[in-house]
């Protein structure tokens, strides 16, 4: 997890962006969020771009969006998550245009080149760390819309230039970090060149120098509105979940786990161990038994080095992997071979585990009920496993890569028909999922937030311990404690990276009015 904290620039509201600094919090129509580690705030910053006098409205919008996208990395490295994907929600109503002329002060007789300077104000919902709950502003920077032509320079000046940054060279906006000393130095040098060249302009209000138009970095001030995080208790709709949604008298958890490593895609991938850790935690709370596996496999017998190894239950397979509690009489090579044999039968298979329980809501009569886990390990870039799990689960949980928003969970891959009509929780435990996989799902769900709660991460989430954290989240949901969302987030605190819940404020369940008993 990247936790570099932004060093404040010596910039106030008079930075190069337009000077209006107050945040109009009424601009946000989003519900407040529930979180343990994050605070929900409205964010604003201003910038400008230069375009040709003949530029169309769409060309101007594209130029502004190219610039606002570069704020993503600047905000991410400052530990701020934003809600609109890649900051594309630009409001054209904030645009102000001014005709300017590019001139060469050393050649006053030359007519210069006409251009249009377009200023804008960008507003978004944001999540910040708790220790930034009262901070009103911070200095950042955005880049020129044509920044892609200078990737090498940006990589060297304004990224850590490590393997992580180099991996993202083609999406340099993701790793742009204006807080770095080398970046501040580069911006200061660029600004000095602009100031020196502009010193002899006869009319600085209408004239600009080529150094200004060609600048790569544009300092700006990010203003933060009041803390609007939900201060009350909110709960999943336990009464609806334990009434049966996608299946009668059954609560279905859809767990999809993706490969995490860049090597071989099998049970040696670190994501496999995380998946097993999730199942281990769930098995601690309820007596889950194997109900089915597709494609069909015999999970009771394994041939290892000429020996036949028997398993009494699915719990044995989990214990072999997570606790190294393998049968006696196996050599070290046999033990490795057994784990490999188990993995070969599980990876790429749909496994259904079921646990019978009895539920009672308030003063109602007890009734038989089933908790199911529909799970799959081995997801990659195909949306097929994710679609199956989402369509057939009441609580969908994904653990894997985010693919910078363009992977299998891209909302563009889904339609309303891909979601059940019943109440549902989606927990997308990937990096920066609050930006990629949050608000765009709400219109895809019939009833919107009346039928959908979302749990996402504002920042990059660590893979290590993710399985344990998600397992704790699941186990608290099914242990009968009526855990609030805050308590569920605390249960999964091992990997909390500005994790937030959205869509929960219109939930009606209240255990003080009608407690759910699960036995």
Model-predicted regions and their roles:
Residues 24-35:
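Short, low-complexity, disordered segments immediately C-terminal to signal peptides
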Residues 33-136:
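Long, solvent-exposed N-terminal ectodomains/accessory regions
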Residues 262-268, 381-383, 404-413, 435-439, ...:
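Extracytoplasmic/secreted cell-surface and envelope-processing proteins
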Residues 425-519:
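Active-site-proximal C-terminal subdomain of hydrolase catalytic domains
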Residues 1-10:
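Bacterial N-terminal signal peptides that target proteins for export
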Residues 19-21:
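N-terminal Sec signal peptide cleavage junction
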Residues 316, 321, 329-432:
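Catalytic-core segments of thiol-dependent peptidases
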Residues 101-346:
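Non-catalytic propeptide/linker segments at domain boundaries
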């Amino acid at each position: 997890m990247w936790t570099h904290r932004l060093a404040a620039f010596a910039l106030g509201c008079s930075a190069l962006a337009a000077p209006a600094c107050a945040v109009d919090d009424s601009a946000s129509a989003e519900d407040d969020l529930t979180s343990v580690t994050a605070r929900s705030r409205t964010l604003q910053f201003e910038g400008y771009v230069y375009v040709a006098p003949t530029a169309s409205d769409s060309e101007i919008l594209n130029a502004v969006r190219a610039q606002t996208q570069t704020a993503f990395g600047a905000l991410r490295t400052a530990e701020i998550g934003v809600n609109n994907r890649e900051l594309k929600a630009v409001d054209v109503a904030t645009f102000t245009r001014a005709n300017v002329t590019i001139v060469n002060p050393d050649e006053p007789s030359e007519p210069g080149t006409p251009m249009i300077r377009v200023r804008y104000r960008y507003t978004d919902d944001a999540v910040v760390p708790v220790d930034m709950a009262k901070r009103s502003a911070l200095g950042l920077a955005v880049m020129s819309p044509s920044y892609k032509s200078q990737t090498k320079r940006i990589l060297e000046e304004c990224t850590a230039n490590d393997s992580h940054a180099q991996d993202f060279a083609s999406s340099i906006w993701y790793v742009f970090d204006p807080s770095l000393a080398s970046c501040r130095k580069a911006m200061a040098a660029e600004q000095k060149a602009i100031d020196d060249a502009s010193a002899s302009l006869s009319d600085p209000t209408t004239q600009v120098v080529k150094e200004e138009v060609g600048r790569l970095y544009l300092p700006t001030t990010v203003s933060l509105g009041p803390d609007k995080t939900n201060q009350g208790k909110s709960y999943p709709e336990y009464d609806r979940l334990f009434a049966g949604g996608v299946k009668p008298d059954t609560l279905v958890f859809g767990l999809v786990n993706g490969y995490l490593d860049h090597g071989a895609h099998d049970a040696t991938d670190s994501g496999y161990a995380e998946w097993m850790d999730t199942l281990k935690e769930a098995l601690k709370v309820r007596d889950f038994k194997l109900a089915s596996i597709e494609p069909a496999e015999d999970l009771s017998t394994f041939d290892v080095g000429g020996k036949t190894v028997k398993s009494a239950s699915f719990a044995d397979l989990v214990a072999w992997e997570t606790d190294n509690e393998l049968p006696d009489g196996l050599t070290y090579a046999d033990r490795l071979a057994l784990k490999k044999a188990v993995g070969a039968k599980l990876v790429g298979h749909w496994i259904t585990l079921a646990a019978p329980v009895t539920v009672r809501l308030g003063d109602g009569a007890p009734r038989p009920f089933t908790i199911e886990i529909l799970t799959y390990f081995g997801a990659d870039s195909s949306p097929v496993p994710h679609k199956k799990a989402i369509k057939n689960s009441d609580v969908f949980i994904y653990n894997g890569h985010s693919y910078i928003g363009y992977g299998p969970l891209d909302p563009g891959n889904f339609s309303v028909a891909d979601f059940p009509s019943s109440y549902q929780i989606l927990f997308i435990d990937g990096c920066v999922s609050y930006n990629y996989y949050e608000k765009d799902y709400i219109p895809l769900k019939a009833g919107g937030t009346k039928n959908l709660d979302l749990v996402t991460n504002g920042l990059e989430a660590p893979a290590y311990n993710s399985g344990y954290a998600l397992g704790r989240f699941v186990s608290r949901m099914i242990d009968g404690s009526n855990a609030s969302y805050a308590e569920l987030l605390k249960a999964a605190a091992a990997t909390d990276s500005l994790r937030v819940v959205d869509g929960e404020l219109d939930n009606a369940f209240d255990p003080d009015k009608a407690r759910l008993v699960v036995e």
